[in-house]
């Protein structure tokens, strides 16, 4: 087959204009290969200008590129390796391994631009996705094939929570995880890789990175690379896959960096006019089908803590559950530092989770909310000024707060406590016993950093016998 060859006519930062023969214009989203100075640069067609020119976004650095260089149309979108051969490996946006471990034995190569599953293929059934983490399963449960937003500032434990989820999926569910680093720090990616190697989770995980130092084209597309690898496990192997995207805001940011160079007029706050469309194209592909599911956990950076900013606001519309990590809770030494009153879930509904789960979760939230209201009074007047009923609420709330903490498997090396996976029924039973007053005789310190309620009993009985 004869190659379709064009020539570079203009370069503006990461945006390249290439002239082809007018009857051979490459299609939108086609990958174009440019070879110069012994390097290979891949660009993606974004627009057709006039009769014979295409405007492309470079997925690598355009340093040293000049006009007149030959460009070859590959005839299709970027294709990335998929299948079991990708497990335990690290890839870049083009699906090339970057871990110096040799070639990848791929089952197939799939294009990164694919259409979302049709209505017929999607599964409307809503099922709870057990994570084994008490605070999440009880108060903001994840839906199988749902999308979860993980909100949190620096250093409150987003990455540790993500690693624990990856570990629990691999060990308890035997499932695969895809981790996509979008525009985040390379150091964090390195830490994650080293930690995963130590904990042995790496064998069930694929890592895809397009970090802060990459050009905007790469950061814009790397989420699609990770998603395509996840789709293979869902559609061909029938797996329930976990897809982590850290950070979805950087995906939007990269789109906005390129947008102006493509000649688009910016919209609100300088974002790209195609913002909702770009986010939708990514999010609509993350769903459950009749074959399997992709459950995604997306870390979301909130610019200047403003939730009404167009980037987080657009993402919110797609989420089924939000897990908010709070610095105040982390300061109390309660990990995971999930805010039990701020985190929400669409499936916390008696028709989906059942009456008992719904009742226990809402009662726990009521007790914690009342405790929050009483804290000012306690700070000024002390506990003695409270009514007997309020005193009881405070005692129970403090036990609940401590019981929401849990030792993680991935943090064993730091805490010295063995990790715990708590089944949903044990979680519900434990909190039910606290709110019904069956645990009123046990001091609150016994509830801190344990798994099930049985462990609280055991430790208490043991200490009583010792005395």
UniProtKB/Swiss-Prot annotation:
Q: What is its EC number?
A: 7.1.2.2
Question: What GO molecular function annotations does the UniProt record carry, in alphabetical order?
Answer: ATP binding; ATP hydrolysis activity; proton-transporting ATP synthase activity, rotational mechanism
Q: Where in the cell is it found?
A: Cell membrane
Q: Which UniProt keywords apply?
A: ATP synthesis, ATP-binding, Cell membrane, CF(1), Hydrogen ion transport, Ion transport, Membrane, Nucleotide-binding, Translocase, Transport
Looking up HAMAP family in the UniProt record yields: ATP_synth_beta_bact
Function text: Produces ATP from ADP in the presence of a proton gradient across the membrane. The catalytic sites are hosted primarily by the beta subunits.
Q: What is this protein called?
A: ATP synthase subunit beta
Q: Which organism is it from?
A: Caldicellulosiruptor bescii (strain ATCC BAA-1888 / DSM 6725 / KCTC 15123 / Z-1320) (Anaerocellum thermophilum)
């Amino acid at each position: 087959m004869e190659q379709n060859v064009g020539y570079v006519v203009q370069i503006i930062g990461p945006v390249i204009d290439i002239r082809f023969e007018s009857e051979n214009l490459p299609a939108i989203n086609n990958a174009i290969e440019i070879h110069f100075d012994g390097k290979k640069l891949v660009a993606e067609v974004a627009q057709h200008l006039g009769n014979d020119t295409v405007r492309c976004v470079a997925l690598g650095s355009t340093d040293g590129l000049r006009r007149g260089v030959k460009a070859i149309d590959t005839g299709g979108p970027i294709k990335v390796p998929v299948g079991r051969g990708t497990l335990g490996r690290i890839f870049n946006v083009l699906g090339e391994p970057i871990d110096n471990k040799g070639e990848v034995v791929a089952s197939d190569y799939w294009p990164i631009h694919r259409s979302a599953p049709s209505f017929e293929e999607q599964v409307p059934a809503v099922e709870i996705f057990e994570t084994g983490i008490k605070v999440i399963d009880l108060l903001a449960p994840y839906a199988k094939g749902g999308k979860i937003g993980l909100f949190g500032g620096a250093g409150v434990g987003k990455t540790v929570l993500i690693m624990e989820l990856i570990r629990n999926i691999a060990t308890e569910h035997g499932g695969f995880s895809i981790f996509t680093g979008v525009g985040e720090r390379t150091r964090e990616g390195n830490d994650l890789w080293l930690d995963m190697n130590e904990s042995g989770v790496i064998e069930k995980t694929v890592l895809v990175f397009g970090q802060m130092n990459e050009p905007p084209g790469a950061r814009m597309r790397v989420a699609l690379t990770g998603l395509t690898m996840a789709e293979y496990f869902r559609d061909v192997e029938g797996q329930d896959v976990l897809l982590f995207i850290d950070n979805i805001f950087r995906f939007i940011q990269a789109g906005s960096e390129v947008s102006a160079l493509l000649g688009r007029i910016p919209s609100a706050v300088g974002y790209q006019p195609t913002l909702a469309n770009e986010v939708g194209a990514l999010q609509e592909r993350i769903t459950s089908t009749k074959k399997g599911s992709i459950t995604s956990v997306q870390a979301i950076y909130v610019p200047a803590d403003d939730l009404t900013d167009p980037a987080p606001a657009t993402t919110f519309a797609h989420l089924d559950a939000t897990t908010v990590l709070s610095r105040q809770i982390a300061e109390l030494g309660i990990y995971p530092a999930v805010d039990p009153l701020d985190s929400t879930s669409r499936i916390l509904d008696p028709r989906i989770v059942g009456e008992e789960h719904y009742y226990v979760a809402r009662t726990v939230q009521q007790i914690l909310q009342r405790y929050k209201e009483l804290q000012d009074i306690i700070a000024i007047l002390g506990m003695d000024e409270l009514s007997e009923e309020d005193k009881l609420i405070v005692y129970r709330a403090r036990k609940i707060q401590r019981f929401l903490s849990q030792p993680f498997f991935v943090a064993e090396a730091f805490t010295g406590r063995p990790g715990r996976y708590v089944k949903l029924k044990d979680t519900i039973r434990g909190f039910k016993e606290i709110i019904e007053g069956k645990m009123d005789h046990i001091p609150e310190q016994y509830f801190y950093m344990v798994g099930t309620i049985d462990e609280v009993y055991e430790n208490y009985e043991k200490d009583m016998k010792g005395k």
